[in-house]
Amino acid sequence: MGALAVFAVACLAAVASVAHAADTKKPNFVVIFTDDQDAIQNSTHPHYMPSLHKYIRYPGVELSQYFVTTPVCCPSRTNLXRGQFAHNTNFTSVLPPYGGWAKWKGLGIDQSYLPLWLKDQGYNTYYVGKFLVDYSVSNYQQVPRAGTISMPXVTPYTFDYNTRLQRNGATPNIYPGEYSTDVIRDKGVAQIKSAVAAGKPFYAQISPIAPHTSTQISTNPATGVTRSYFFPPIPAPPHWQLFSDANLPGGSXNKNLYEVDVSDKPAWIRALPLAQQNNRTYQEEIYRLRLRSLGPDELIEQVVKTLDEAGVLDNTYIIYSADNGYHVGAHRFGAGKTTGYEEDLRVPFLIRGPGIKASKSDKPQNSKVGLHVDFAPTILSLAGASHLLGDKGLDGTPLGLYANDDGTLPSDYPRPEQHRQQFQGEFWGGWSDELLQNLRSQPNNTWKVVRTYDESSKQGWKLIAQCTNERELYDLRKDPGELYNIYDKAKPAVRSRLEGLLAVLAVCKGESCSNPWKILHPDGTVKNFTQALNSKYDRIYNAIRPFTYKRCLPYLDWDNEDSQFKTQIRGANPAAGVGHHRLLTAASERAIATRRRAQAAVSAELADGPAVFQAKVEEKSVPVPQDILKADVEKWFAFNNAEYYLA
């Protein structure tokens, strides 16, 4: 090679090195995202999750007032990645037609959400584990636009603790004798090693199914009926004997275990029987099995050690959270989620990383309200892309991490004068207990909730509006367990202000979600709930018509949900936006079913280059045999019992 050529190569190498160095100044992100983990019933206690505290909480911070807004997996995961409430994504259920993989794609969510926004900022993105329930054996060839390397779990294997996973559209693999959380841990660690080797900033999400129930889909050979069966979570073999002395925390501040008097609760809750001793004993064991299944704690340790050995730990944000909360034995319930009560809405959120002051404490060091819709704006801001926040139609705002700034948090990280002190939650559909078969399902569990929290006084209020238009109001400072519905006894000013907030937040979009006071008080005189309680505003709030439902529906229909602010916030025809509920005709259902069957028959694996690092567990993996895969496709069709579900 001539001297000139050598010089040219050297120059190119120098430019590449400088570019690489500049690129790596951006922080990395590792998100560990569990399934159905509560923040109320002590699941994150250091006795049960010591690594969570050692490796994330003590060198970072826990947000004590962190909530989901739709407490069920797939809509909540969509809120997280899109930064929008479910009434703005119109992704409102786990399965079609109101949720599911096809609706996720049909709404265009996979065309514009957090992983793709980060890729546009020069990031590699990685994903392994639970994705959407309806991402299944019938459609796995359609690779989620979620990452450089994407390894989502595939239904009906998603909630099998002997898991199957696929990689970038290839046939799902079985991992004989391997435990789900261990497989996801090993593959997540391998992805991190691959990400570091690639030399670009990265976002890696690791989503174990724990501590979700173990779920099987089976066909009764005698009747031909296919249905799902829920069982308590299955711990890893070494963990079966752990925490045998653990009991449900009935003596906690909430004190709502097996609530005797539910006369002030909605009619459908009053219809639930009080748990008898045999069911209480069973629920105690469910609780212990949930604790024993928290293998993600070991995952945390492996992730931190991998980042440390790679020399990137100090430039990496590590986040731990869950898709929704969970209750065992609260009120009259058995085990599950989907209600508007605290057990289901509150989830853990812990973070460490550059710019965040170490708490070095067992006590939460940040009590600013945070929501899943705030997650995407937070990541963008930490990644140096806060300039994008106004371009993505986000309902959320960055989390209050500025309260824990060690002086090196990005200078453009938003620091609002007034942090969010109120939010809304919502759910559409029925209620059923996951594990107590004696509790009858209830069809009318569609609801909205508005919740406030004043960081200085610790005062919190909650108003729940059921689709039957029954109301519940709780003073959360005096009654954190939501035992005493004071709707008829509360001061009129408190009730009217909460009704006013709900009327705005139930239909909010964009800025009105984080700052409803701008709608209620356009002159800017009121910026929080405490100020709104001033008697001089009584006439304003007494004139506001309460939010109501016309009837109970299992889906979002703007004509069914009435607020006097709907036109002001959403325009004259809100159904024309993303929130449109599109009914399918019989002809379109048949066409969709035909197309889906054709797609499900495709067996050719997508071409894909090997990862830089392969998890050792891959040595044991084998593809799911085609005859079993075909049978499972038919089983999944039969389970859904409506062909357009798989559209």
From Swiss-Prot:
<dbReference type="InterPro" id="IPR017850">
    <property type="entry name" value="Alkaline_phosphatase_core_sf"/>
</dbReference>
<keyword id="KW-0732">Signal</keyword>
<feature type="signal peptide">
    <location>
        <begin position="1"/>
        <end position="21"/>
    </location>
</feature>
<dbReference type="InterPro" id="IPR024607">
    <property type="entry name" value="Sulfatase_CS"/>
</dbReference>
<keyword id="KW-0106">Calcium</keyword>
<feature type="binding site">
    <location>
        <position position="323"/>
    </location>
    <ligand>
        <name>Ca(2+)</name>
    </ligand>
</feature>
<keyword id="KW-0346">Stress response</keyword>
<comment type="similarity">
    <text>Belongs to the sulfatase family.</text>
</comment>
<feature type="binding site" description="via 3-oxoalanine">
    <location>
        <position position="73"/>
    </location>
    <ligand>
        <name>Ca(2+)</name>
    </ligand>
</feature>
<feature type="modified residue" description="3-oxoalanine (Cys)">
    <location>
        <position position="73"/>
    </location>
</feature>
<feature type="binding site">
    <location>
        <position position="324"/>
    </location>
    <ligand>
        <name>Ca(2+)</name>
    </ligand>
</feature>
<dbReference type="InterPro" id="IPR012083">
    <property type="entry name" value="Arylsulfatase"/>
</dbReference>
<keyword id="KW-0479">Metal-binding</keyword>
<feature type="active site" description="Nucleophile">
    <location>
        <position position="73"/>
    </location>
</feature>
<keyword id="KW-0325">Glycoprotein</keyword>
<dbReference type="InterPro" id="IPR000917">
    <property type="entry name" value="Sulfatase_N"/>
</dbReference>
<dbReference type="Pfam" id="PF00884">
    <property type="entry name" value="Sulfatase"/>
</dbReference>
<feature type="binding site">
    <location>
        <position position="35"/>
    </location>
    <ligand>
        <name>Ca(2+)</name>
    </ligand>
</feature>
<feature type="glycosylation site" description="N-linked (GlcNAc...) asparagine">
    <location>
        <position position="42"/>
    </location>
</feature>
<feature type="glycosylation site" description="N-linked (GlcNAc...) asparagine">
    <location>
        <position position="528"/>
    </location>
</feature>
<dbReference type="GO" id="GO:0046872">
    <property type="term" value="F:metal ion binding"/>
</dbReference>
<feature type="glycosylation site" description="N-linked (GlcNAc...) asparagine">
    <location>
        <position position="444"/>
    </location>
</feature>
<keyword id="KW-0574">Periplasm</keyword>
<feature type="glycosylation site" description="N-linked (GlcNAc...) asparagine">
    <location>
        <position position="90"/>
    </location>
</feature>
<keyword id="KW-0378">Hydrolase</keyword>
<dbReference type="GO" id="GO:0018958">
    <property type="term" value="P:phenol-containing compound metabolic process"/>
</dbReference>
<dbReference type="GO" id="GO:0004065">
    <property type="term" value="F:arylsulfatase activity"/>
</dbReference>
<protein>
    <recommendedName>
        <fullName>Arylsulfatase</fullName>
        <ecNumber>3.1.6.1</ecNumber>
    </recommendedName>
</protein>
<feature type="glycosylation site" description="N-linked (GlcNAc...) asparagine">
    <location>
        <position position="279"/>
    </location>
</feature>
<feature type="binding site">
    <location>
        <position position="36"/>
    </location>
    <ligand>
        <name>Ca(2+)</name>
    </ligand>
</feature>
